Amino acid sequence: IQTKKEVSIKCTLRDLVSKRVTSPEDWMMLQPDSYIEMMAQPGGENLLKNTLEICTLTLARTKTAFELILEKANNTKLTNFDLANSRTCQIFRMHGWNWIKVCHAIACVLNRQGGKRNTVLFHGPASTGKSIIAQAIAQAVGNVGCYNAANVNFPFNDCTNKNLIWIEEAGNFGQQVNQFKAICSGQTIRIDQKGKGSKQIEPTPVIMTTNENITIVRIGCEERPEHTQPIRDRMLNIKLVCKLPGDFGLVDKEEWPLICAWLVKHGYESTMANYTHHWGKVPEWDENWAEPKIQEGVNSPGCKDLETQAASNPQSQDHVLTPLTPDVVDLALEPWSTPDTPIAETANQQSNQLGVTHKDVQASPTWSEIEADLRAIFTSEQLEEDFRDDLD
């Protein structure tokens, strides 16, 4: 037999999960009545905390970051959404990249389909758009844990039961390099939490921004090159070097949901099998994002031909020559309807109308003479013989 209190908590929990509530602030804004009701009960703070923890755990275990982003897409805006002119893709276009390929790779990582390459790394100089892209993705996911470098002993204290881990301005990993490598590769590990016991982190996508070369690990004064390649194997490397103008602005919160919906709509599923089908191979550390080139007009509104040069190579096209039919031959050899008028006479008539006289005008062949020459060269037998040679 369930008590009234149990029924109330279960109903509240279902509402919180359905509305994707992941923080006390979201709860206060979206469900203020249930928040006040629980807060007024004895032990209300612990009740709020435990209820919210169940909600975030449910989302982390049943949904991926990509799915949470996709849910927020506005289908009415998707019809006229221009992917190439979105702020995120404008940044990629500044570098001459295939912006569909980059977005597709990011979507695969967010959907936990990147395998060992479980981290999206935006790195490069300041003011190149690293943080605004990462912030837009994190806001679209909602259930995000942040790495706290200031908390030396418990830097991952906020990263349990999350759909995405955001590491802003990452620096030298130092003595935490092994923990970083485990989390960045999507392994299940246990971490220590302040005032609590250890807690398990399930495979969670990571998004990271930095101005430094994080592949160089220094512990004290000693450089540890053995960690360089393992770190590269865990990162989707996106190096941004083009500085943005001062009035570029932030990425709209609705942009990434529309990007994900656009990819799904046009057949770019967020799986590594689909990625290799479109782009030939899995992404690597030194991936060339500029290849293959995107055809002009690939994302113009209403454009249905979304094929890139990767899928339009000559080997994939089977061209079959059509035999030359008799009616085509007759049409080619049919007498022309143009009057039998010399070209020179026509030019003189036009010149006289304009008040201009031409001297020493060389006589040009008439249309009949040109037709006779062409008929002598391209006879019916010759056309059929040439076409038969092409077929052979």
UniProtKB/Swiss-Prot annotation:
Q: Which InterPro entries does the record match to this protein?
A: Helicase_SF3_DNA-vir (IPR014015), P-loop_NTPase (IPR027417), Parvovirus_NS1_C (IPR021972), Parvovirus_NS1_helicase (IPR001257)
- Domain characteristics, as noted in the entry: In the N-terminus, the endonuclease region is involved in binding to the origin of replication. In the middle, there are the ATPase and helicase activities. The C-terminus probably contains a transactivation domain.
What is the name attached to this protein's record? Answer: Initiator protein NS1
Q: How is this protein organized at the quaternary level?
A: Homooligomer; when bound to DNA.
Judged by the first EC level, this protein's enzyme class is hydrolase
Q: Where is the signal peptide?
A: none
| Cofactor(s) recorded in Swiss-Prot or TrEMBL | Mg(2+)
Question: GO terms for molecular function, please?
Answer: ATP binding; ATP hydrolysis activity; DNA binding; endonuclease activity; helicase activity; metal ion binding
Which reaction equations make up its catalytic activity? ATP + H2O = ADP + phosphate + H(+)
Function of the protein: Multifunctional protein which displays endonuclease and helicase activities required for initiating and directing viral DNA replication. Also plays a role in viral packaging and transactivation of several promoters. Binds site-specifically to 2-3 approximate tandem copies within the origins of replication (Ori), unwinds this hairpin region and nicks one DNA strand thereby initiating the rolling circle replication (RCR). Cooperatively binds Ori with host PIF and probably other host factors, which activate the nickase function of NS1.
Q: Which GO terms describe its cellular component?
A: host cell nucleus
Quote the record's binding site residues for ATP.
124-131
UniProt keywords, alphabetically: ATP-binding, Covalent protein-DNA linkage, DNA replication, DNA-binding, Endonuclease, G1/S host cell cycle checkpoint dysregulation by virus, Helicase, Host G2/M cell cycle arrest by virus, Host nucleus, Host-virus interaction, Hydrolase, Magnesium, Metal-binding, Modulation of host cell apoptosis by virus, Modulation of host cell cycle by virus, Nuclease, Nucleotide-binding, Transcription, Transcription regulation, Viral DNA replication, Viral genome packaging, Viral release from host cell
Major location category of this protein = host cell
Q: Which organism is it from?
A: Feline panleukopenia virus
UniProt cofactor note: The endonuclease active site can probably bind other divalent cations.
Q: What Gene3D superfamilies does UniProt report for this protein, alphabetically?
A: P-loop containing nucleotide triphosphate hydrolases
Report the record's Gene Ontology biological process terms.
DNA replication; symbiont-mediated arrest of host cell cycle during G2/M transition; symbiont-mediated perturbation of host apoptosis; symbiont-mediated perturbation of host cell cycle G1/S transition checkpoint; viral DNA genome replication
Which stretches make up the SF3 helicase domain?
Answer: 91-253
